[in-house]
Amino acid sequence: SLGRWWCFFTLILVTHPLLDSLTTYGTQLLWPLDAPPAAWPIVFIIDPFYTLPLLMALIIGSVSGKVRSACRTGLVISCAYLMMAAGAKWSVEQRLTPALAEADLQAAPVLIQPTPFNIALWRATVIDEDRYYESLISVFDRDRVPALEPLRRNVELEASALEGPLGQRLTWFTGPFLRFETRYINGQETLVATDIRLGFPGFHPFSFTLATREGNRWVPVAISEEVRSPRGVHLATLARLAARAGGDVSALCASDYVEPQWRAEPFLYRC
């Protein structure tokens, strides 16, 4: 009927952006208004535990002929998973609060998001001017104050990086969650900004050129280029991630894979 077709397409158009808003990057719910993306990250961008119940429901429904009941069951399971994710994030926020108070970072920008492919292990990123802090918190951790591991942002490069329109657009999208560095690209000193939200410390996939050095000043680029990360994730890394998600604090620290030049206090590590 026309009513069912209307519901079908309306729910697709409404629920898809709402689900996107539950990830780290979020989505522009108010588009075409030029408002920053709305993001309440409680699930990773790719989470098999959310997707598989829906996929299995379609397969079972197609085989058994009971499409409606199978899809209803799959949807209930996936929605219950989102509710569990919201509860897990709330628990992590409560555990992180004492650590922020101890470091006098209560007013600092904080991003709490699940690590890849699960809702048991969460990553907290805290911005504090010239440095930022990373922390891993599992819902299975015992009563312990999370460790905040300090890393460099190279904030002295921030003004030059964000001077041009491309830099302004990038910070509109990322907020303060950027770090900066200089690299030689095609023989030219180039200012590069990295989005530290997605991925994992040491494995950030998105970096962009924003300015080049001409004489004694930085000149914003006309066209920004993505700079690919040479590092990949190995199975051993995922195994350590899984062990840390289970509550083994010694299995993985937030800064274990971070290159030495980003460590703000090299001798204070090992969570």
Identify the residue ranges that each predicted region occupies.
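Short, basic/low-complexity N-terminal boundary segments at the transition from targeting/disordered tails
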Residues: 12, 98-102, 161-162
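Internal/C-terminal transmembrane anchor helices
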Residues: 65-92
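A short glycine-/small-residue-rich loop at the edge of a beta-strand within enzyme catalytic domains
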Residues: 83, 87, 112-115, 167-168
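Short, conserved, surface-exposed binding loops centered on an aromatic residue
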Residues: 114-116, 125-126
